Amino acid sequence: MRTALLEVGLEELPASEFHSILKQLEERSTELLKAYRISSGSAEVFVGSRRFGVILKNLPERQEDFTEEKKGPPLNVAYDENGKPTKALEGFLRNNNASLENVVHREGYIYLSRVVEGKPVEEVLPDLFRDLVLGLNFRKPMRWGSGEHEYIRPVHWIVAMVDGRVLDLEIFGLRSSRISYGKRYHAGSIKIPDPERYYESLKKGFVISSHLERKKFVLEQIDEFEKRSGMKIERDEELIEEIVAITEYPRIVVGQFDRKYLELPEEIIVTAVKHHQRSFIAHKETLTNTFVAFQDGPQPPENVVKGYERVINARLEDARYYFQKDLETPLEKMNEKLKEIVFQEKLGTLYDKVERIKKISERLCEDLKLPESFTQKVLEAASICKADIASKVVYEFPELQGVMGRIYALREGINEEIATAIEDHYSEEPQTVIGSILGIADRIDTIVGNFAIGNVPTSSKDPYGLKNKADAIFRIIRKNEWDISLEELLTFASSLVGYRLSEELETFFAGRFYQFLVNELGISFDVARAVNHLWKRPLRGILSAEALQEISEKPEFQDLFVGFERVHNITKNHDSVRFDGALFEKEEEKKLMNKFYEVKEKVLKALERLNYREALQYLIELKPYIDEYFDNVFVMVKRDDLRVNRLGFLKNIDELFMMVGDMTYLVKRSQV
């Protein structure tokens, strides 16, 4: 079996594109191997800060053969009355370099069917590699040189080989060779003898091409540091992945910052060191003043360590100054400064947003029937939940928004429950009741406000993260088991920005509810569709979905779904639920009516307790009565009064079922 290599050398790639490039390379390599009929091959991709590519292993000598078919003239045109080939058939064969041996008859036409031999693999690999390189998509491609080419970064070299032979490949005006390049400033050109020795060759030039090997190398150095120092480093996966993305030969740097900065809140220290210098803080029982960073290149000289220390000390000195200044300003005064900070141009200032959050939170407290004393805590938290955005520390370190609000609130002696909620309401899954209420109110205000001014997300663009905010609302409601009307909250929030609840906004939330059920709760597509109309009261929709998911596979319920479909289909164009039992002529009508009243009472009581499983058990009691009804009662009679009366009665049954779910979506499953 043969092995091939493709390496594309570029200027430094943005770390934000690392995972996208990696995923695309993996998917495209697999797709192209199949498309080029090299199905036995396997792909091992690699991405570094200045290169990416793939090693293809287990390649055959040639592509797989395939059978080619081409449609020709109809049989009555291809042969004369004596069954001999006509000029039309002869011309078709001549044009396709084929003979009568290649002809098959099918569906009244001539078809050419012949085996096409696969080409030698070295002949097709250049096209495969070209398709791979040019088929990658990037968020912000750029042009370089004469502007003729567009790519993620300017390309400087290409290595393309199969075994020890260089492939004939040209991309971006560059011809492939066996020459790669090592770490900038530490190594020059590197001759690659063959794909099998690619990784080994580059290591001599201080490049670890494999991202998996780089990650392993980083973790090994952290392990070694911990053993040597007796300290611990938190394995921050996000930071480790970023280091792997921006380095080609990561080497550990250990330094220390001034101990006086340990007086700062831990969150400030970690943020200044991690987010702004891509470094880890070492722990013993508590935070230490030792940090661990990673330099790209061979063992760093002493001045590199001093450089890290100088920059980190400077960042922490700035943070200390901002923190001390902030302590001079109470949160209440910071909140007043929000009047000078625009939330969004057409939605006013952040102060205006806080006022809306307070009103939505108060309305939510009313819906939840919370005690007045607790509501006051919620409103107190709401009034200062964005105050720290006006602080100097958050201006310098935006990722500490909410965190600093909690810290400043505790420093002022504000109730811990309220202080915690300031940070908690930003969480995707708030851990406190106050944080959950503020989290819903904040997100509803943002979503409604953006829809009001025309910032509506699409399938490909959601710059304000409205989809994630909607998902978080459903998540919070489910976690707290709050039976609230989301529709009423949206209507109320809309009135605060001079907006009316639109069909567009309702469609958005219905769509997000469906995605939430399927993607987060693992609800099947058909069940999610069956309860999607219940998004207006999300907890009920969720509980109904979970109950339907559980029982929908049971045989006794399949018949129920079919019975409901008969009722639903015949009443779907009838809106009224009015009927008069005195007009019933058949005994089956009266029996179904009496059973309906009995079942309805039990179903409604079960739904009051939010027990959807019990409600479904009651609904199944209607099944034999519905079957008997349709076997003996003709609904669509000519007499208007009888027909309308029967439809009105059946509409009552339809609406009772719809309180649990639209089971027509589940009938399809039962018929598979």
Curated annotation (Swiss-Prot):
Catalysed reactions, semicolon-separated: tRNA(Gly) + glycine + ATP = glycyl-tRNA(Gly) + AMP + diphosphate
Enzyme Commission number(s) of this protein: 6.1.1.14
Localisation: Cytoplasm
One family name in Pfam for this protein: tRNA_synt_2f
Keywords (A to Z) from UniProt: Aminoacyl-tRNA synthetase, ATP-binding, Cytoplasm, Ligase, Nucleotide-binding, Protein biosynthesis
GO biological process: arginyl-tRNA aminoacylation; glycyl-tRNA aminoacylation
Highest taxon of source: Bacteria
GO cellular component terms, semicolon-separated: cytosol
GO molecular-function term, one example from the UniProt record: ATP binding
NCBIfam families per UniProt: glyS
Subunit and interaction comment: Tetramer of two alpha and two beta subunits.
Family assignment from sequence similarity: Belongs to the class-II aminoacyl-tRNA synthetase family.
Protein name: Glycine--tRNA ligase beta subunit
Species classification: Bacteria, Thermotogati, Thermotogota, Thermotogae, Thermotogales
